[in-house]
From Swiss-Prot:
UniProt feature, compositional bias: Acidic residues: 39-78, 205-220
Primary gene name: MCM2
Organism lineage: Eukaryota, Viridiplantae, Streptophyta, Embryophyta, Tracheophyta
Tissue: Widely expressed, with higher expression in developing tissues.
Protein name per UniProt: DNA replication licensing factor MCM2
Subunit structure, as described in the record: Component of the minichromosome maintenance (MCM) complex, a heterotetramer composed of MCM2, MCM3, MCM4, MCM5, MCM6 and MCM7. Interacts with CSN5.
Keyword line: ATP-binding, Cell cycle, DNA replication, DNA-binding, Helicase, Hydrolase, Metal-binding, Nucleotide-binding, Nucleus, Zinc, Zinc-finger
Start and end residues of each MCM domain: 524-730
Keyword Ligase set for record: no
Species assigned in the record: Oryza sativa subsp. japonica (Rice)
Amino acid sequence: MDDSENNAPSTPGSPGFSTDRLPPNTTTSRGATDPSSYSDDDDDDVVGAEEAEVDPNVLPEDDGVVAAEEEEDGEDLFNDNYLDDYRRMDEQDQYESVGLDDSIEDERNLDEIMADRRAAEAELDARDVRTGAAPDRKLPRMLHDQDTDEDMSFRRPKRHRANFRPPREPRTPRSDDDGDGATPSSPGRSQRGMYSGGDVPMTDQTDDDPYEDEFDEEDEMNMYRVQGTLREWVTRDEVRRFIAKKFKEFLLTYVNPKNEQGEFEYVRLINEMVLANKCSLEIDYKQFIYIHPNIAIWLADAPQSVLEVMEEVAKNVVFDLHKNYRNIHQKIYVRITNLPVYDQIRNIRQIHLNTMIRIGGVVTRRSGVFPQLQQVKFDCSKCGTVLGPFFQNSYTEVKVGSCPECQSKGPFTINVEQTIYRNYQKLTLQESPGIVPAGRLPRYKEVILLNDLIDCARPGEEIEVTGIYTNNFDLSLNTKNGFPVFATVVEANYVAKKQDLFSAYKLTDEDKAEIEKLAKDPRIGERIVKSIAPSIYGHEDIKTAIALAMFGGQEKNVKGKHRLRGDINVLLLGDPGTAKSQFLKYVEKTGHRAVYTTGKGASAVGLTAAVHKDPVTREWTLEGGALVLADRGICLIDEFDKMNDQDRVSIHEAMEQQSISISKAGIVTSLQARCSVIAAANPIGGRYDSSKTFTQNVELTDPIISRFDVLCVVKDIVDPFTDEMLARFVVDSHARSQPKGANLEDRVPTDVEDDPLAAARQADPDILSQDMLKKYITYAKLNVFPKIHDADLDKISHVYAELRRESSHGQGVPIAVRHIESIIRMSEAHARMHLRSYVSQEDVDMAIRVLLDSFISTQKFGVQKALQKNFRKYMTYKKDYNELLLLLLRTLVKDVLHFEEIVSGPTTRLTHIEVKVEDLKNKAQEYEIYDLRPFFSSAHFRDNNFVLDEGRGIIRHPLAA
């Protein structure tokens, strides 16, 4: 070690102290002995004050050193005795006259005076070196006052700011200090309290950051005092540095309060973004405004300048945490989500110009992808000099004035090889049909998509756009209106599909835990069926079929060549007024990507695909219909029987192969239509005739009927008992749905004690909410993929053989090989409903029961009784015995009522009906039910107003007056 290193002072406050006074075995800190710690940038900074440490046991107390340290700390002028300095002292308040002669003149010339001054300065400098005190007499500091507030835009040099930093507290030595005197930080945080990203210390990150700066508390308060307009304020250099500093701290230190692990939220999101090989970082506006409310308001009111700074900071942070990611993406885009203010398209005005807005609507048209200039270079045609690069954005237009080499004013041509382009696409966003006021036309707005937002939405999808509402010059509008008019567009920053609100990454951990808890309920299948359209009374077979269709089976792709559909198609056929359309409307609100259409309002191209000429590019473009828009969802077709035969034939391919082939206008392609079809139709003549076959009751051909997995026939049968229950259910439903302020007691007088049906009309706790049902279906379709075993296939084959034999005698719907696939699909759907990864015997039995119900309901009335008797063991599976006995009891009541009307005449008023218990026992034995006592004590028996008279052996049921 040379002398210069030995003589280096360890602390600025200990004059004359050097390391040669220490014993040979004493270890000094890096700040005292390492010459690298004294760089040119830090020569004015007090770098060793908090790092050098001296063992108090090695050196004795030195009064001179202690006095020097106290002298450096300074004297407290405002102590208790500071007024003593101003007391009157006559003996000292006089000037000495000795040695003072006003007549003496300095005869030195200017050179001698300057020489003496330089000698005095040299002596003072030498004294400062001996005492170890910094001279700190630099001319630039004399030219301005550090406390002035006249020009807050002046940025002090970093070395100058270091001289005025507040003194740091002395660091207490710790046993876990490393060898160079640095204190190990907590995991995931740097010494400044920020995440260091593994091998990259924050000191290395900030040295190369052009936006890195330090602001004291007063500087930060001044940054929030906007001077002038906000758009001009955020373009100032010191404000941009301040925004960058705060946003960097937010990215590296924000912890989500909902995160129990306490990890840094956006460091985790950055890592997930890198794993997904994406270049967009989503920033939650609500989280950002909670930490930095002023900057968040600046972001909403002046988004162009603020986003530019935020994207630059995000790029530096990502590339610091992941060094090699700059080789994959050259830029990181900041996407703002959860903007709290939502505006309608028709409410956008001039006040929203150049601000960030959030709007929603339906995409009606999407242009192609075009290249847009981003970084352009020009060639001078006269001298060949390459000019540039010039950065082009949506707000400025690059124009070259003259060539710096030959001073010519052109012409200039674009250098194609060195010019960089970016992707550009335009969407037309139209108001959603449900929010357009009556009698008004829907309004639309152009949306610009750039970079990785290309093709994020397609025509027909409902989306929400967060972006900058800006304007551009449109020559056609000026020509049309005759005065300057600017076209307004929305430059998209973030696009979210409304169908994705219940997608996988939107489900929280609490939602997943609740869904898995529901799946453990052995009655979850019954609860889901009850939750399908709970406002519709009865129709358990239709609700079961719709539930299976919403969950769907497992799609199979045989070696990538032949695909077997996993979606389940359902046809509802019945009399008018049996809630067929209401079932479709409920599925539209509950199902994922449900598209609703009608047979009369939809043509062949409206259901499949259409080819039309784009009005802007004059090119033929392909636009998908309802089946294409419902890909991976459900297509709902009402009034299916009203469609033309040509239109109905066009969906044959879509229902079985789940694709649509197009060969029009030079476009030969195939579109995906992987969706379930749930259709509703009315029979011929308006009423279903049970004496005729299914094909005779509906105007549908066998090819289209065989493509439906489940056929549900709904008949409006006159049944006094059922009609009374239905009427009570409807009236009670209307009573509960009265608007606020209505007096329900005046409208529907009910008394729980007098009315035994009051309890049954209360809300069923087994019914799931619509939102929970949405989440449950989404979770099941994305995470559960059930498989079927070979043992289950034998039972399916046996049932198929029996059905083929029975269908040959009847005149109903013929049984084909497609029905085997239907049983397999429904088995998989039932297993998915219970979140099982395999198909059990229970799932196969349920699928067989649903198919048999569908098959028998399409037969003639006379054939149905025989089929029900033959397939009784399958049809009674998992049916509640109490419900079955209640159905048998209702049948007996109806038979007795019909007999009494024949004997006594239709004008006879009956107050009650009596049914023998022995008759009910005989009916129950046909279904292998021998004990009726549980039924007599059940809620089904009691709530349906039945009374048991054991002494007489009869069951009494009162009739409505």
